[in-house]
Amino acid sequence: MQKPKLNKVKYSFSESFLIFAVALAAALTGSLIGLLIDCFILKISGTVDIIEVWSELCYTKIISLFSFFGIILYFHYDNFKINWQRKKDYKIQLKEYNSYMSYIENESMKEFVIDCRKIK
């Protein structure tokens, strides 16, 4: 029986870049949805009007930021959850390994004592 190893999940560079790209796409989609909501609420009809009231486009900013950071946090939480489960499994395997090794050590000590008694 081999001693168990704790293998943590780490994102590679390409996976991190993909997560970042998905988060940017979600932020862009969220900003477009927020812009539609803002245009409807503020009754904006053209591009010139959007530039004039840029500071008042609160839904655009809020939804895009929420989308971006929400996606990033979701993937980090998912990674944390996987590592947490692996750590729990590792602890269980380590307990089993330690009990098995103590059993083997105990048995070998008994055999050693029996052999020593035979020699006397």
Swiss-Prot record:
The superkingdom listed in its UniProt entry is: Viruses
Stated name of the protein: Uncharacterized 14.2 kDa protein in e-segB intergenic region
Tell me the gene name: y06N
